[in-house]
């Protein structure tokens, strides 16, 4: 019984789409990251905050940033997205058609009332009658293509081997081609004057129940009998009827059979008659190059389509005229098609992405698989294309895109987005000067043309007419001028693809962390020259600058004060030390080079309890709110002595101070110009209310009302949230039902509100970075739950349209133990205006942590490492870090340089400049050893006696192979301190750190780095391998670089026949086992450096994974053909014995053990993104006396796994609390192991064993959530996960992504679901904490 939890969602961008989605005039970017759908808006910001990314020549320009609006975890894998303009949408913008794996389509729109997606329809094409042919390929093994007509008249979805689904869309009137539904898709050029009124469109929409007509499925052979092997298709521009071009072949293309199947590709243009469900072939072009793989439709002024091949580009216009250019010397050898020769460019077009970057000309930006950009220009002769030219982009293009692009989107105004699965995705742009340069080459349309010619000029830009004098050079010159100002607007960072992971000792300078055994997860990320080390942690682990003892202190505040004499700003830290239950002493420290105590006799002389400390009067006065008085640093305002009310909550924003007293009344003070405080007279409506909490918000951006207004949020005892504008105290809005915690807070009370949460504090705070900070409403409950709401307006920012959308927060607070309960009372939330460049909020207490948000991410909670945090405060300058108070004392700390706060885990990246395939950590030397590779040219060996003709090979465009090397990285500076190159064409297949026996006499054991390599020189030559044994030794360092005191020393080298594909430590005598060729051999290291074989096992195929259950001798062998083998190793005598096999022949990519009590499970990841749980149970009758591994369950993750690693599991807070309260020994029920799964798309998952009782509760909860929740895009989580289990003893794996959505429900819905499940809410919360990653307590 296991549960799969996705700790980090997929990060690699697979698809991108530019569309006006939130409104008709919006500029949005929709990004798909495998199963994560994100909706961004483009926001222009001034360059005053951007000094690092923009060059001085562009200081007068604005830059553009991506701001995340919403994101959705989809129970499905996105395969394509396209935009569709339908009759009527809720937002007025376009709709989006999303294609999923297994032939599903969802039509979605934006709903401004809910500020989220609304599913219009979902279309399934996976029925048996669609693929009932017994020899047809399975849908999961076939690709799919989605394309929409530019006029939004229909969309086509090619799925399976040769099936085509056509979905017609209703359009206004009988004529489908109208001005506002024209063939030009660019929303920035949409015609303003519509020929029909909006009322007429609404009338047309009312005539149809759905925006689409009935779809139908045809085989491709029904359109053209010769379409046997489809390659690519796309709808074309400038056709009155829906028309698409399809690239196909009648026989399968093959590079190996090129001499027989040369130029066998066809290109056909087919127009559709949607009413008659018929088609007509307009033109067909034959004998095209066999390496063509993609069709790109080109808008005016070029028109037609661009066919992309591995070695050439081919343009075909509307009349079937072809123009081609070859970009390497193989274009002539691979094809006889007529083309222009540009073979001197030596470009490789595999996996390239092409996108236009301007509306003024037809030039295209080509992103190659290496990250290099090239410019594709068309020679226009009037309306006809007479030639193509390609020009590589000179300059540091690697700074823009580090590796292969996977998708692209043109966003208008000189902005192009390139998504990547193997590097950061980038938003590129050009300066306005370059746009003017390009426009200078465009001619103007003469005024005496006819109306028909004017309409054609809308389709065909007049730019080519001005280029006819020098058609070859002018487009290139304008484009080169444009590229001179190329720059990066924004990035979407990605820690994927994750190729390998290792655990290492934390590199932070914190001595107590080392004692606590804090580790960090280091991953090898990126491809090609974008290789990077990523350091990940679950919690904020700050760098301690200074510490001091403060045993009796229980609260902390930080203030930055501006002296009256305009002297330099000074930062202070104020501690409160409790003397008695109602008395405390305040100590003041000034922050200089270190904390220096100062004498402040007037500061809290009566030793009252402090409620809040802040500044007013433009930071010239320090205000201290005590229980019975409010004090300024030189002026005091005292309450009436006869008034025994005391302050319990305070909030302040210049020049106001609001205090909630113990009788739930409000006291409002205002500071005058001199800093003195005066009481503000309140209206009777405010005085008569009983208030629970108050919070000020300075609306500098004018989100709620006029800019620079002060907004006061008040929560009363009926859980109504009043929003007031000061100084006139006008009511902006009254939000109902706050205590019910519904998904959307509004002025309407919730329908079912019998159950409420006890909300103790509210806070409205800006969250974000320097590019985008937005206000959020934070609610803190009595259980330390933080509920985050995002405000939005439903109708043009009218006050009645103010609503709050609940953001997902799946971090559960820790259950306090006995020690924590003895700590001081609940500390209020602390607003942090600037911490590491981000505005944030901090929650003290046993579950202390921050809520961070970046412009491209949603708010998320990250804990601060440590125990009970009593208080934390930051300073005005982020360079000074922050101060916090815990049980160890007072600390000044900073976040490590380069820390990324945009993910649920803390991350830092260390660029290496080469692709990192493997990495390992050496604890003895505290270093990391990397196995990197770089591309190098490959020549056939000239000394081969069997092939003397290879010596006569004449080729300049050589193939490339990987050449590996080893690098030593010091975590002190995260720099490479040593390197060891391997032979040419030698590639590292596996690398691990092992404790090996180095002496047969003394039996001494030391940590060694064992490397297995493969030396492949081509298909005709058998591969060889080698086993290297290295040790990291200590040497004399460079005096200026003390971290260079480590070097690699080669201890042994053992060449073997066959590639070394897997390694593992085995047994208890310091031996290793290596998979070499088709054998797995146990070897021991001798003193002379040789590796002596002692036992072996014959394998049928090349082994991809070997794992040993440490110290037991039990190991697994896995490969992609013969499945998984479970074997054992004995030392007396040395022997390998086969125990059991997987008879299902799984395609094993990665695997590891998962012990659960007295049960032994094996987790296997296959090539179809599935996880299998196998069990070795010889007592089960189905195991054939233990010869068969039992397949207990199957679970579809949707992520292509790269590693599966067994890790120890720590107890979560609820388990520790139960073990502490119950004197019985119940630790046996808590699982002690878990498996971490990393993927190529950057996601990280966790497989956790679940006890029987918890499994029953969670399984019932999952069933309830599957049936009751509204799933995005209308998908079915049960069908997506495709859970299969052994009916006799197996249990299906649980889906934590679905289970954790229970936390996002309202209080009433939680109580109802818990009642149906038959459990209490506390039991469900404890179960969810156990599966949500809390067992990784050492990270």
UniProtKB/Swiss-Prot annotation:
Signal peptide: none
Pfam family, one: Beta-prop_RSE1_1st
GO MF, one annotated term: RNA binding
One example of a Gene Ontology biological process annotation: mRNA processing
GO cellular component terms listed in the entry, alphabetical order: mRNA cleavage and polyadenylation specificity factor complex; nucleus
Region (Disordered) location: 436-455
Compartment list: Nucleus
UniProt xrefs under InterPro entries: Beta-prop_RSE1/DDB1/CPSF1_1st (IPR018846), Cleavage/polyA-sp_fac_asu_C (IPR004871), RSE1/DDB1/CFT1/CPSF1 (IPR050358), WD40/YVTN_repeat-like_dom_sf (IPR015943)
Protein keywords: mRNA processing, Nucleus, RNA-binding
Biased composition (Low complexity): 436-446
Family classification: Belongs to the CFT1 family.
Known function: RNA-binding component of the cleavage and polyadenylation factor (CPF) complex, which plays a key role in polyadenylation-dependent pre-mRNA 3'-end formation and cooperates with cleavage factors including the CFIA complex and NAB4/CFIB. Involved in poly(A) site recognition. May be involved in coupling transcription termination and mRNA 3'-end formation.
Record's protein name: Protein cft1
Source species taxonomy: Eukaryota, Fungi, Dikarya, Ascomycota, Pezizomycotina
